A protein has these predicted regions:
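Short coil/turn segments at secondary-structure boundaries
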Residues: 12-13, 76-77, 141-142
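Structural recognition of the beta-strand scaffold that forms the well-ordered cores
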Residues: 30-31, 63, 91-95, 127-129
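Catalytic core and acceptor-binding pocket of nucleotide-sugar-dependent glycosyltransferases
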Residues: 48, 120-218
Length: 218
């Protein structure tokens, strides 16, 4: 997780809940707090933190979660998610940036980006489950390089626009990217975690607190 101190209002709940989830499944949890750049939006420091972690650690898999995510239970393991969605040709799994309405109808959250890019399923860079291999390292090298060169890098949603317009348009990259279904993670209540969006830090904190109390304090 990459989370700067200004997010402590809700990471005081998110971090200990993720730590307990990781402890339950014998995973390691890492928290990166410091920005890497003065001239780039913090989303690029998040991508940089993932890149650095891949190069500095010998883990087989890495899950990056945004600071505004929190586990909803400790039952679902990463191994189960990998078994379900990391098929033989996939290297990276993203959260779908959308929700299922009426159970079966999927709609992207960013309709403007979906229509412009002609992609109904868009990646959400707030939840990324990946292998730690040369192909994934090269993926993050390229993604980060666009932060300094792409006109999309400064237009929200910055890193996701770069991903959609400049990376997923490459066949070899599109083929290595997959998605977890919305029942795993979404902005309502996924089986693994909930990813809050379009809310103030105080609103996120208020929504996270009861989950934290149920899973950590009980």
């Amino acid at each position: 997780m990459f989370a700067t101190p200004n997010l402590d209002v809700y990471t005081q709940y998110a971090i200990p809940t993720w730590e307990k989830y990781c402890a339950t499944h014998s995973y390691h949890f890492f928290h990166y707090r410091d920005a890497y750049y003065d001239d780039l939006h913090l989303v690029w420091s998040k991508i940089r933190s993932v890149r650095e972690h891949l190069y500095e650690h010998d883990c087989d898999y890495l899950l990056m979660v945004d600071a505004d995510t929190i586990p909803t239970s400790f039952e679902l393991s990463i191994e189960e998610i990998l078994s379900e969605f990391m098929t033989h040709d996939k290297q990276i799994l993203f959260q779908k940036d959308g929700s299922n309405r009426l159970r079966y109808l999927y709609f992207p959250h960013n309709l403007k980006l979906a229509f412009r890019s002609k992609r109904w399923i868009l990646p959400n860079a707030g939840f990324i489950l990946m292998k730690n291999n040369d192909a994934v390292k090269a993926f993050f090298d390229e993604w980060l390089a666009h932060a300094h060169s792409s006109p999309y890098a400064t237009q929200a949603p910055r890193n996701q626009q770069v991903l959609v317009y400049e990376m997923l348009t490459q066949t070899q990259i599109e083929n290595m990217v997959g998605y977890v279904e919305t029942w795993v993670v979404n902005k309502f209540k996924g089986k693994l975690c909930q990813h809050f969006s379009s809310k103030t830090p105080e609103q996120i904190a208020a929504l996270m607190q009861p989950i934290y109390r149920e899973l950590v304090i009980r």
